[in-house]
Amino acid sequence: MSDKPATPTKHALEDEDEFEDFPVDSWPSTETLKAYKEGDSCLWEEDWDDVEVEDDFTKELKKELESNK
């Protein structure tokens, strides 16, 4: 037996080791951060709170909010 320490072997990159290329997102220009910063767009849905939810928690919360006005 030899007294040399074992040297690690280097493996070539396999196809599966490479990074996957993802397609570029094609956002409408009105929905980009640049349009938002320039004031041309609103990234939030304007009617996000228009949804009526009628569960017990919501009813109790509305009642509490009305009493605190």
Curated annotation (Swiss-Prot):
One of its GO terms (cellular component) is proteasome complex. Residues 14-23 have a biased composition (Acidic residues). InterPro entries: DSS1_SEM1. GO terms for biological process: double-strand break repair via homologous recombination; filamentous growth; maintenance of DNA trinucleotide repeats; mRNA export from nucleus; proteasome assembly; proteasome-mediated ubiquitin-dependent protein catabolic process; regulation of cell cycle; SAGA complex localization to transcription regulatory region. GO terms for molecular function: molecular adaptor activity; protein folding chaperone. The keyword Transmembrane does not apply. SMART domains: DSS1_SEM1 (SM01385). Residues 1-26 are annotated as: Disordered. Transmembrane segments: none annotated. Pfam families: DSS1_SEM1. It comes from the Eukaryota. Keywords: Proteasome. Belongs to the DSS1/SEM1 family. Subunit of the 26S proteasome which plays a role in ubiquitin-dependent proteolysis. Part of the 26S proteasome. This is Probable 26S proteasome complex subunit SEM1. It comes from Eremothecium gossypii (strain ATCC 10895 / CBS 109.51 / FGSC 9923 / NRRL Y-1056) (Yeast). The lineage of its organism: Eukaryota, Fungi, Dikarya, Ascomycota, Saccharomycotina.
